[in-house]
């Protein structure tokens, strides 16, 4: 059985989207107050259950863990889908990146979304939505990803 999202639950798609809204002084799904800047740190593969299981090794992070601070990764829980959700503010069915390996029908091959990029692939044809960074820049706000 596939996992079902919680009704009105928060997901990775809400994180940067809420940061941008807070910087613009707008309401947002995370309930962030108006801010001037935001820094988001994502530790790939570090879900709430893994953090609970290793709480003794990550006391600062695990100490901040509450039921309200846990958000859904989305589905599927691959890095490609999750990072695209984080950076576009959209769920995988909307942004189009749903797994690691996908068919590149234009070149009749299977490519890896994380490491298989070459000159024959155009990112704009795979990621169907603009990123939060692109929208921030279009609004005249500085934005960067490291």
Spell out what each predicted region is.
Residues 1-38, 45-133:
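Active-site nucleophile/metal-coordination loop of metallo-enzymes that catalyze phosphate/sulfate
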Residues 40-41, 145:
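Structural beta-sheet core signal
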Residues 127-146:
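Feature for exported/extracytoplasmic and membrane-associated proteins, marking the mature portion
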């Amino acid at each position: 059985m596939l996992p079902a999202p919680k009704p009105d639950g928060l997901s990775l798609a809400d994180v940067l989207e809420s940061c941008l809204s807070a910087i613009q002084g707008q309401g947002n799904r995370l309930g962030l107050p108006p801010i001037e800047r935001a820094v988001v740190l994502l530790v790939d593969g570090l879900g709430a259950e893994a953090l609970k299981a290793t709480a003794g090794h990550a006391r600062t992070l695990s100490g901040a863990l509450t039921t309200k601070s846990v958000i859904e990764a989305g589905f599927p829980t691959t890095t490609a889908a999750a990072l695209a959700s984080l950076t576009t503010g959209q769920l995988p069915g909307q942004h189009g990146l749903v797994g690691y390996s996908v068919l590149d029908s234009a070149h009749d091959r299977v490519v890896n979304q994380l490491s298989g990029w070459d000159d024959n692939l155009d990112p704009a044809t795979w990621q169907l939505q603009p990123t939060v960074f692109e929208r921030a820049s279009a609004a005249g706000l500085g934005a960067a990803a490291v």
